[in-house]
Amino acid sequence: MEIDIHTTAGKIADLGRRIDEAVNAAPAAAIDKQRAKGKMTARERVLRLLDEGSFTEVDEFARHRSTNFGMERNRPYTDGVVTGMGTIHGRPVCVFSQDVTIFGGSLGEVNGEKICKIIDLAVKTGCPLIGINEGGGARIQEGVASLARFGDIFKRNTRASGVIPQISIIMGAAAGGQVYSPALTDFIVMVDQSSQMFITGPAVVKAVTGEDVSLEELGGARTHSQVSGNSHYLAANEDDALEYVRDLLTYLPQNNLEDPPVYDDDEESDLTIT
């Protein structure tokens, strides 16, 4: 049935249609490919991380503005990153989750603006920021506009350091600029046999140095957990990674002006003060 947007009922119906389109922006084939690897979608990760029913999405109708290389013919809602606010154990947090099923999770101009906005919101409201990272770096089709947004994100990571907790979860292959930002945050969580962090991939390493190296050797979860020290926790799977972050936040203050949470001890202790 055609929607008449000149009526109140029509406007509400049109809003519902667009929300549904934003929630289901990713191609079905890309989602099937993601699930075949045992991975959640970007939105499923956010909903699994946050308290049930607490997520409020921001800028779900955002779309890229690029007209280069035929990009104007493919303008999905969200532009490849889910952003918003929610709660973990009742405490507010800000979160973004990069969507590898849309443009390979690459960061474009609008995509980067959404991430900058959610970082600004986290700092302004004094709540932790959690980034779920998976993607191939800069969106080449958007050129320097994409690269400029990386600079904006790095600047915000630096300014937020020591002000709010910043936690990064690497949920798949993350390359280029999409690993610089996590390296500037306080904690990095990676998933065994699933996550990789590297500046550039094995093919480029082979071309430049002549060395054959696998994804896992170059930037796998075990490499960064046991060799480089970039990763602070090696998760068994995505559920484990998300649950670890939920637990981690119970030890951290909301921001630099608050004390860490204090809990009653439910168990009797044999310790005595002398």
Could you say what each language-model-derived stretch is?
Residues M1-I167, A173, Q178-Y180, L184-V204, ...:
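Terminal-region recognition feature
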